[in-house]
Amino acid sequence: MEKKMFCYQCQETAGNKGCILKGVCGKDFSTANLMDLLVFNLKGIAIIMTSMRRAGVKADYRKADKAIMESLFATITNANFDYSSIAKRVEKTFALKAELYSLAFTQGIELPENEAVTMQGKPEEYDRLALSVGILRETDEDVRSLKELTIYGLKGLAAYAEHADRLGYVDEEINAFTERALHDVTMGLLSAEELTALVLETGSFGVKVMALLDKANTETYGNPEITEVNIGVGSRPGILISGHDLKDMEMLLEQTEGTGIDVYTHGEMLPANYYPKFKKYNHFFGNYGNAWWKQREEFETFNGPILFTTNCIVPPKANASYKDRVFTTNATGYPGFKYIESDQHGRKDFSEIIALAKTCQPPTEIESGTIIGGFAHHQVLSIADKVVEAVSSGAIRKFVVMSGCDGRQSGRNYYTEFAEALPSDTVILTSGCAKFRYNKLQLGDIGGIPRVLDAGQCNDSYSLAVIALKLKEVMGLDDINKLPIVYNIAWYEQKAVIVLLALLSLGVKNIHVGPTLPAFLSPNVAKVLIENFGIAGIGTVEEDIRTLIA
């Protein structure tokens, strides 16, 4: 069968081998190919930037740093489906590459004769050029696997760096590493062993970027606190905000105050309810709906406008009534959806969304009651003595980390069934949208400690690492793997990849990953991860309960 594209970066890739005609996500082949060209341009920019850094050139690298992070983010699964949006990024990166090339030349820097550096193109040439720079350009399966594992980790890292940047938090070391890593996977000079080391180094920078984002979020909005979140609806029109960007959340709440419009979170924005600064807004009503993949039904019943601040977009059905009510911003895009630009100071005008909301009916109730969350590291460590006592007394036998992503595949019911089957002396630690598989189950508590502790968004997996390291210290252990903590993680896209690599860099072993192992892991690379880190897939609920809860 003719390959019109090749992409295998997400968990739902066709046949767990790769999408070759159209993305399972809904992305058409021309847009997918154009993303390959965009990433290729970023590699060229990274080679130039790394060469200049190594030569000690003093220059303003900010423009290039932002271009790399924002464009990597735009290629994450379900972030941007808009060919024209990606084409604009390709055009800008060609121009930036030429500008940097000229700067390097004037500084007397000899750049590598790599096609990623030298390639230039016009819009009418993009589709042709894109066909020559895709993933399969690397013919060695194992080398390709290690390179793509690094790149997908960098995409997740870039997403977190971009969120932190929007709050004014930037780490130049993270930017420089991202560029060096792109340089290294492109130049083709590293052995398989060196590429494996680069994968783990990417994980260590994943820890750094999650720490940076945690600092940005908590210093700006306060430490998340235990919160009961309303999952019902009010009597006023609403705006539904999805994604991960807390800066957009803040601006939307500011601009809707006093307008008669309520604001609801959806999907990964649920943890915004846990931050003290947002609680002062009386019109911040609660959370509507569940994980990202249910949006086709939930957006219909919400009745009001929807704002995507980041992934995950699901292409609407042709007859969807909500298509004209969806807005995108930042790295996101979809043909026909309106895009909200930011000004030179990062501010956005949401007046069009607010005006539309005023013409809409209130949300239709799809559930009622409350759910509890807000168990990030600051909150949990404030009751560390209670937690350690519960472990020491045997009241808590195991903590089960079930962070990660949710998805559409029917096999993901496994995670609901696994949570239900866990013994009553176990506690689930979660973050990311995987939580929606079990955060509404009535699993009770252990001595006042809820059996599902939600730390927040996928990046708040950092909180779970902080908690684990603190418990290791308090319990006097010399190895993080001696803690009564096991890992059964669901993955979907590239932010889950950087979380996994971060855990590996911290020395965590025996992580179970599902519902399938990534297609981009070649048999040999998978073997290395299995032998060195104990990485495993999932089996049946009964088998995995026996394996993990000994």
UniProtKB/Swiss-Prot annotation:
Gene Ontology MF annotations: 4 iron, 4 sulfur cluster binding; hydroxylamine reductase activity; metal ion binding; peroxidase activity
Chain sites annotated for binding hybrid [4Fe-2O-2S] cluster: 244, 268, 312, 405, 433, 458, 493, 495
Chief localisation class: cytoplasm
Note on how the cofactor is bound: Binds 1 [4Fe-4S] cluster. Binds 1 hybrid [4Fe-2O-2S] cluster.
Subcellular localization(s) per the UniProt record: Cytoplasm
Recorded superkingdom: Bacteria
Modified-residue entries (Cysteine persulfide), positions: 405
Entry annotated with the keyword Iron: yes
Catalytic activity, reaction form: A + NH4(+) + H2O = hydroxylamine + AH2 + H(+)
Residues annotated to bind [4Fe-4S] cluster: 7, 10, 19, 25
An individual GO BP term: response to hydrogen peroxide
GO CC term, one of those recorded: cytoplasm
Record key words, sorted: 4Fe-4S, Cytoplasm, Iron, Iron-sulfur, Metal-binding, Oxidoreductase
Annotated SUPFAM superfamilies: Prismane protein-like (SSF56821)
EC number of this enzyme: 1.7.99.1
Swiss-Prot/TrEMBL cofactor(s): [4Fe-4S] cluster; hybrid [4Fe-2O-2S] cluster
Annotated family: Belongs to the HCP family.
HAMAP family: Hydroxylam_reduct (MF_00069)
Functional note: Catalyzes the reduction of hydroxylamine to form NH(3) and H(2)O.
Name of this protein: Hydroxylamine reductase
Taxon lineage: Bacteria, Pseudomonadati, Bacteroidota, Bacteroidia, Bacteroidales
